[in-house]
């Protein structure tokens, strides 16, 4: 047992268990003020959640070497800057649920992960790595979108950090008061394999339309 804390939020004690032999074996146990057992989070060990979080963290650290680099030619220093990488790993029940619409088809199945297994993070990145990039730029155009997307692909290729797809938003910089206008280009799940110069602007225009249709569908479902 690593530590016990008291939560004023729920009025309970939480004991945090750290396994000395399992990198995915950490969990917590909750007790009432009278010492009665309430619940535990051991399911996160058994269902692959802990393993997924470990892999996600390792991939995030890889992508951060580029996206948090002070030398990045795009502003990543503002409080509203959004640039990160993630692995798309989800429970099978969510992947199979027809009412869940925000899980990409290329997602890895959390239930299939092996406890404590040392995975090749770059290999997983090539299968399910997802970049989320919000870029501030004075010019909002399909041509600028293509140029910047090619630039990011080049940076990740040179660093040998694979990804499968990117979400990309091109928007105007905010004012000194932190305000922004509504003009932007927004693309969801643009595949790495489609980021090449020949015909890129055409593919981007199609992706813009598909992304707009996706959000329109979500609005209709509200």
Tell what function each PLM region has.
Residues 1-31:
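Exposed beta-strand-loop-beta-strand "reactive/processing" segments of non-cytosolic proteins
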Residues 40-125:
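Non-cytosolic head/periplasmic domains of membrane-anchored proteins
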Residues 1, 71-75, 158-163:
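Short secondary-structure junctions
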Residues 25-46:
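A short, surface-exposed beta-strand/turn
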Residues 23-27, 138-144, 175-179:
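Short, surface-exposed beta-strand/loop "edge" segments at domain boundaries and coil↔beta transitions
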Residues 8-15, 91-92, 175-185:
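Short, solvent-exposed polar/charged micro-motifs at secondary-structure junctions
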Residues 145-222:
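Extracytoplasmic/luminal low-complexity segments enriched in Pro/Gly and acidic/polar residues
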Residues 107, 119-168:
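Mature extracytoplasmic domains of secretory-pathway proteins
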